[in-house]
Amino acid sequence: MTQLTHGGDWAGYRAQYGHDALDFSANVSPLGLPQGVANAIAAALPHADRYPDPLCRALRAKLAPHEGIPAESILCGNGAADLIFRLAWAAKPRTALVTAPTFAEYAAALESAGCAVRRHFLQAEVDFAVTDSILSSITPEVDMVFLCQPNNPTGQLTPLPLVERILRRCEACGALLVVDECFLDFLPDCDALTAKALLDSKDLLILKAFTKLYGMAGVRLGYCLCANTALLEAMQAAGQPWAVSSLAQAAGLAALDETAYVAQVRALIAQQRPRLTAGLRALGLRVLDGRANYLLFQGPETLGDALRQRGVVLRSCSNYPGLDGSWYRTAVRTGPENDELLKTLAEVLA
């Protein structure tokens, strides 16, 4: 059985080596699942004999004031990836535009729906930043445009004025702009960076997830925001009716109360990202100045395997269009974990 290569394949590592690794390949909160969320999941177990609410009514009602968006403009799914595939199957775009490098599931979902995928290649000379040059790639033949904010794996943020120019270009060409903000909430200034103020346009859909910020990748819970309720209804109908389990819904409801936890995660990332960046550069590695809870850096192509044999796992970016085997993505984790990564890197590079 084959599938797209992603980070966080702890099961594959354990099967190969017989033990767990220090995993920097998955971009989830280094603080783990909040205790309040774990308690909510446990409390929901006695009701697991019931079907979950297919419309996630309670969760959407609580998300509405949290996001400042009407509940009818919110759709929940089995992680953001589920919603990406539902969107492709519901909208059935003929041609779509993605940046390169970026998250692989955009193209995978689009191609599964028979869509032709065009790539706007970002340039290493400007640290793979999205610039105004993307506007000329949005033509009347393009039905959908994906923009990851901050981009995965580069960690680069597209300035909000440029996001708005991209949206206006999409509107002029009849395309839907999909802005993936799944990692944006790791930033303390996320409220000033989100595209939510542009949601009066029915040509904008924003993707969000509980997975990363709340350390609940195994629970699978994401949602999207869009003023085009007809599109959301089509997405709801494009997959199975009970995509979000009752345990995941309980987890989401509890997670929205974890304000102290979120503040702690944001403070940790803000402290550790520049520290890890400096440590990597001190080893002679090229590191991009990203804003996310992960970093993209360049090193020897043998680096990933050498670390893996020592029990440390990075995300090789060799399968990202626009990158090669010399690029790696590392999560920003706790101070002791980051120190262990730097120590092991120093041994390998010596």
What are these regions (language model features)?
Residues 1-50:
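N-terminal "arm"/small-domain region of PLP-dependent enzymes with the aminotransferase-like
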Residues 32-34, 55, 203-287:
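PLP-dependent aminotransferase class I/II
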Residues 52, 64-86:
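Short loop-beta-helix segment that forms the pyridoxal 5′-phosphate
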Residues 89-147:
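PLP-dependent aminotransferase-like
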Residues 111, 129-141, 153-177, 181-213:
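Active-site pre-lysine segment of PLP-dependent enzymes
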Residues 119-121, 144-151, 177-181, 288-289:
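Short beta-strands and strand-loop turn motifs
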Residues 161, 309-310, 319-350:
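PLP-dependent enzyme catalytic core of the Aspartate aminotransferase-like
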Residues 269-270, 280-311:
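Conserved PLP-binding catalytic core of the aspartate aminotransferase-like
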